Swiss-Prot record:
Organism: Saccharomyces cerevisiae (strain ATCC 204508 / S288c)
Further facts: Present with 1240 molecules/cell in log phase SD medium.
Modified sites of kind Phosphothreonine: 559
GO cellular component, one term: nucleus
A family per Pfam: bZIP_1
Taxonomic path: Eukaryota, Fungi, Dikarya, Ascomycota, Saccharomycotina
SUPFAM superfamilies documented for this protein: Leucine zipper domain
Keyword Phosphoprotein: yes
Family the UniProt entry places it in: Belongs to the bZIP family.
Protein name per Swiss-Prot or TrEMBL: ATF/CREB activator 2
Compositionally biased tracts (Low complexity): 39-57, 123-134
């Protein structure tokens, strides 16, 4: 399939492309200016072809820089090809086309064919050679733009703002990429051009739908670069995974403001409840604490003590103005220097003897040498020259170096009980500090739990007190209603008694009184059965004993409710409930 769209797809800024465009214009002018040779018997066909070439195909723009140049050029070549294929039987043998196969892709143009068609075929061959000489990256861009132009001209992609297929998407379809350029080596008919264009459009349409309409695809390089640090340790390619919320794979980095759970929980120290809690780890707690202040070294006090011990020997201090500068000129006096050197040696030996006789027995030899170097700063007698010589000797003393000074500081730190970082003692002290913090937190949690338990106990105690008050109130209320009911029944009995005396006499009055007492007893026993009360005081009506029996065993007996004797027993107690061990006495 020859469409000529390779002219438009090549970058116009390239010098080689400019030469190709210029050569294309010259070849096109040659094709249009030359006449198609034909025989005398085919004058009608030649006239038809000439009139067809003068139609709309020639009136359109044939400038290679025009966007419609590829379509116009394809129309001109197809018209020439239609003339040669439709009239190959009527032409002379030198202009005929070999008819080997019906398919247009298998038709080969003879060297003695039409010169105009040969020029068009030569133009296509030159174009293919130029494409082979170009770089692979330029070829990929040409092919991607070629497919994009096919989609735009065929109306597959209607939205101009929609992203077309790029060279990265086209690289996945090798068969589609190779099919279109291979068709340009032949001269197919209009029907084959339409069929090939439709097939390419269909393939590109489905490819574009799959690439652009997938909501889970990650084609943005900026997103890939942003997410690559999170998944690089596992070798996960995020371009092949859908983005889900929450993600289907575990990230290698912790979340925002989430501590890394690396601390081991001690279940024997009351820390078992911390396994599922999001609490601050002891590592962070230890690292967030401010560092301890450095140890204070009182060198002035040390020098004062030495001065006091050596007071009878040295009793004059060097003035501040006598301290020399490093850049000052040195005045050498050999006699005085030798004398001062002997005195400094005597002073250092005396200081060494005093330090050895001191009670510090665990001091190493290095600290002694450090103190020997520091003794040269002590005050001496003899004026400014002696002070200068002592300072010179102190600066020239190789024993007093920064290394020895650092060891002296470490020695002072160790004497105060601070272990050196990195040692076993330091690790043990750090572990003990962690355990101390964990134990304090455990005690704090226990204290909070105890306070909560005490609070709940107080609340339940208050509720019980309120319930007891209500119970007493209802007991008194029931006793009052009982008394009121007795009074009411007696009044009713009196009325009945007066009416019955005239008829029956004294026997009827005794009978009515016994019926009233029995009715009250029946009501009381019914209430006791409903409330599982076993004993009630006869005078006050308060509950004395309550029956504690499971609900499933309350009605497990075979006795019927109608067989229960409702008459009271002597003493106001039920014989069935006297032997129950679970009865509770209420005072």
């Amino acid at each position: 399939m020859f469409t000529g769209q390779e002219y438009h797809s090549v970058d116009s800024n390239s010098n080689k492309q400019k030469d190709n465009n210029k050569r294309g214009i010259d070849d096109t002018s040659k094709i249009l200016n030359n006449k198609i040779p034909h025989s005398v018997s085919d004058t009608s066909a030649a006239a038809t072809t000439t009139s067809t070439m003068n139609n709309s195909a020639l009136s359109r723009s044939l400038d290679p820089t025009d966007i419609n140049y590829s379509t116009n050029m394809a129309g001109v070549v197809d018209q020439i090809h239609d003339y040669t294929t439709s009239n190959r039987n009527s032409l002379t043998p030198q202009y005929s086309i070999a008819a080997g196969n019906v398919n247009s892709h298998d038709r080969v143009v003879k060297p003695s064919a039409n010169s105009n068609y040969q020029q068009a075929a030569y133009l296509r061959q030159q174009q293919q050679q130029d494409q082979r000489q170009q770089s692979p990256s330029m070829k990929t861009e040409e092919e991607s733009q070629l497919y994009g132009d096919i989609l735009m001209n065929s109306g597959v992609v209607q939205d101009m703002h929609q992203n077309l297929a790029t060279h990265t998407n086209l690289s996945q379809l090798s068969s589609t990429r190779k099919s279109a350029p291979n068709d340009s080596t032949t001269a197919p008919t209009n029907a084959s051009n339409i069929a090939n264009t439709a097939s390419v459009n269909k393939q590109m349409y489905f490819m574009n739908m799959n690439m652009n309409n997938n909501p889970h695809a990650l084609n943005d390089p900026s997103i890939l670069e942003t997410l690559s640090p999170f998944f690089q340790p596992f070798g996960v390619d995020v371009a092949h995974l859908p983005m889900t919320n929450p993600p289907i794979f575990q990230s290698s980095l912790p979340g925002c403001d989430e501590p890394i759970r690396r601390r081991r929980i001690s279940i024997s120290n009351g820390q078992i409840s911390q396994l599922g809690e999001d609490i601050e780890t002891l590592e962070n707690l230890h690292n967030t604490q401010p560092p301890p202040m450095p140890n204070f070294h009182n060198y002035n006090g040390l020098s004062q003590t030495r001065n006091v011990s050596n007071k009878p020997v040295f009793n004059q201090a060097v003035p501040v103005s006598s301290i020399p500068q490093y850049n000052a000129k040195k005045v050498i006096n050999p006699t005085k220097d030798s004398a001062l050197g002997d005195q400094s040696v005597i002073y250092s030996k005396s200081q060494q003897r005093n330090f050895v006789n001191a009670p510090s027995k665990n001091t190493p030899a290095e600290s002694i040498s450090d103190l020997e170097g520091m003794t040269t700063f002590a005050p001496t007698t003899g004026g400014e020259n002696r002070g200068k010589s002592a300072l010179r000797e102190s600066h020239s003393n190789p024993s007093f170096t920064p290394k020895s000074q650092g060891s002296h500081l470490n020695l002072a730190a160790n004497t105060q009980g601070n272990p050196i970082p990195g040692t076993t003692a330091w690790k043990r002290a750090r572990l003990l500090e962690r355990n101390r913090i964990a134990a304090s937190k455990c005690r704090q949690r226990k204290k909070v739990a105890q306070l909560q338990l005490q609070k709940e106990f107080n609340e339940i105690k208050d509720e019980n007190r309120i319930l007891l008050k209500k119970l007493n109130y209802y007991e008194k209320l029931i006793s009052k209603f009982k008394k009121f009911s007795k009074i009411h029944l007696r009044e009713h009995e009196k009325l009945n008694k007066d009416s019955d005396n005239n008829v029956n006499g004294t026997n009827s009055s005794n009978k009515n009184e016994s019926m009233t007492v029995d009715s009250l007893k029946i009501i009381e026993e019914l209430l006791m059965i409903d409330s599982d009360v076993t004993e009630v005081d006869k005078d006050t009506g308060k509950i004395i004993a309550i029956k504690h029996e499971p609900y499933s065993q309350r009605f497990g007996s075979d006795t019927d409710d109608d067989d229960i004797d409702l008459k009271p027993v002597e003493g106001g107690k039920d014989p069935d409930n006297q032997s129950l061990p679970n009865s509770e006495k209420i005072k």
